[in-house]
Swiss-Prot record:
Gene: pepA
Protein name listed in UniProt: Probable cytosol aminopeptidase
GO MF term list: manganese ion binding; metalloaminopeptidase activity
InterPro entries noted in UniProt: Leucine_aapep/pepB, Macro_dom-like, Peptidase_M17_C, Peptidase_M17_leu_NH2_pept, Peptidase_M17_N
Principal localisation: cytoplasm
Database matches in NCBIfam families: PRK00913.1-2, PRK00913.1-4, PRK00913.3-5
Similarity comment text for this entry: Belongs to the peptidase M17 family.
UniProt source species: Bacillus mycoides (strain KBAB4) (Bacillus weihenstephanensis)
Record's cofactor remark: Binds 2 manganese ions per subunit.
């Protein structure tokens, strides 16, 4: 699909950057020679816009071998960021898709500044080509034919091998994020814990990873009472899924990802209202993020050791379902008083984290659509984070900045720990109250990480979006897939 060339040949469409400073630049003047000065006229008439994210389509009318030029407005160079570039290219690729373009090119060097080099631009362009043109996988009888971009050429004076490598990495990041999106968008009668486990096994086998899928009997033997409690009301069997990637000869410095895999959450006996229940098929967004990251890791083969653990079940109501006031025993041996059956994700993660440690994880990152409280605190564009280790958090933060998936650290104070330990009957309670809800959930999970360096990522606000945006349609976003993978790729770098 991807090619690198030094000069333009014949293409259906070409993407070109247009900064505020480019109105009279030598670059525009050179391109304008073929248009006999018409580009300058369009700029002066403001029909060719340099405004951020503005997409201006110009037909060559046979003046060049390119049928259409798509000029991408990027504003002033001083305010140019990777986020600006991602959003603008997202709109550009949507425009190409709407025009059913199959052969396109990008004048890569037109996007290069002292802030972003050609490798950065190539990575982002290939990544966004997948993200921006993703479409919801529907179950409608009448399916529309989709025209795919079949050829994409980067025009640049830079080293072709380096640019090809950046295009490949970006493409893998985008494709894996879309894989996660598709998982989250699947209906719960299709994506059960069993089906999620089957997907994970196929992924592991494709990339020659080791894997384990624990069945209910094995979980009982290991004392995974927290996950099993959540599963009590269901006719669907639970699964504890583990993928093991060995990127080093020696099994050390193991990064452990733990993704919440609740395939549907009714709230249990602490039942959600109707309007709060619709959409709970997405409560396995953390599992999808982890699996998406493992897809990238499998493709790119970084020299790191990684474990991905997914505790999976649905949370439903029946005569056998767990109840408020129950006391359960987790795999760690810690007992938990259940005050809210709708705070089930942290119970599943408790056993998931303990199991990841058992498998040898030296560093932990859990990802979960955990609390409505984090949405109240941070909105729908920022993921909440908590940690017991600032050094590990800084690495996660740097990865999130590189991928433009912003995170914000929430605190853990001793008084928060005291609140989750406030129980007359057990070591912990799973829901101390609504105040500081996101912090309480993260603090609870931290009790199972114990001394192992750990970062908690609450993606309840960022996992899905209610409307179309520059990088995709409404629905799942694939939040944290690229951040987790980038963390592994950069782990330990100074």
């Amino acid at each position: 699909m991807f090619r690198v060339q030094k000069e333009l040949v014949s293409h259906e469409a070409v993407i070109v950057a247009l900064f505020e400073e480019d109105k009279k630049s030598s670059f525009v003047q050179e391109l304008d020679k073929a248009f006999e000065g018409q580009l300058q006229v369009l700029l002066e008439e403001k029909e060719l816009s340099t405004k951020k994210k503005a997409i201006s389509k110009v037909h060559s009318l046979g003046k060049t071998n390119v049928k259409r030029y798509y000029f991408v407005g990027l504003g002033k160079k001083e305010s140019y960021t990777t986020e600006t570039l991602r959003a603008a290219l997202g709109k550009a690729f949507k425009a190409l898709q709407a025009a059913k373009v199959q052969d396109a090119a990008i004048l890569l060097d037109s996007f290069v500044t002292d802030k972003l080099d050609a490798i950065d631009v190539a990575h982002i362009a290939a990544e966004v080509q997948g993200l921006g043109t993703y479409e919801l996988q529907t179950y409608k009888a009448d399916k529309k034919d989709r025209v795919e971009l079949e050829k994409f050429t980067a025009i640049t004076a830079e080293d072709a091998q380096e640019i090809e490598a950046a295009l490949t990495v970006g493409y893998v990041h985008g494709r894996a994020t879309n894989s996660a999106r598709t998982l989250v968008n699947m209906p719960p009668n299709v994506l059960t814990a069993t089906k999620l486990a089957e997907y994970a096994v196929e992924l592991a086998e494709k990339y020659d990873m080791d894997y384990k899928v624990l069945e209910k009997e094995e979980m009982e033997e290991l004392g995974m009472g927290a996950l099993l409690a959540v599963n009590q009301g269901s006719t669907e069997p639970p699964k504890m899924i583990a993928l093991i990637y060995k990127g080093k000869e020696e099994w050390k410095d193991v990064i452990g990802f733990v993704g919440k895999g609740i395939t549907y959450d009714t709230g249990g006996y602490s039942l959600k209202p109707r309007e709060g229940m619709v959409g709970m098929k997405g409560d396995m967004g953390g599992a999808a993020a982890v699996l998406g990251a493992m897809e990238i890791i499998g493709e790119l083969r970084p020299e790191q050791n990684v474990i991905a653990v997914i505790p999976s079940t649905d949370n439903v109501v029946s005569g056998t379902a767990f109840k408020p006031d129950d006391v359960i025993t987790s795999m760690s041996g810690k007992t938990i008083e259940v005050l809210n059956t709708d705070a089930e994700g942290r119970l599943a993660l408790a056993d998931g984290i303990t199991y990841a440690k058992k498998l040898g994880a030296n560093y932990l990152v859990d990802v979960a659509t955990l609390t409505g409280g984090v949405i109240v605190a941070l909105g729908n564009h920022t993921t909440g984070a908590m940690t017991n280790n600032e050094e590990l958090f800084e690495q996660v933060l740097e990865a999130s900045m590189e991928t433009d998936e912003p995170i914000w650290q929430l605190p853990i104070f001793e008084r928060d720990k005291e609140r989750v330990k406030n129980s007359k009957f057990a070591d912990l309670n799973n829901s101390p109250g609504r105040e500081g809800h996101a912090v309480m959930a993260g603090t609870f999970i931290g009790e199972f990480a114990e001394e192992t360096p750990w970062v908690h990522l609450d993606i309840a606000g960022t996992s899905e979006t209610s409307g179309a945006h520059d990088l995709g349609p409404s629905g799942a976003t694939g939040a944290m897939v690229r951040t987790l993978a980038t963390l592994v790729e950069r782990f330990g770098e100074e």
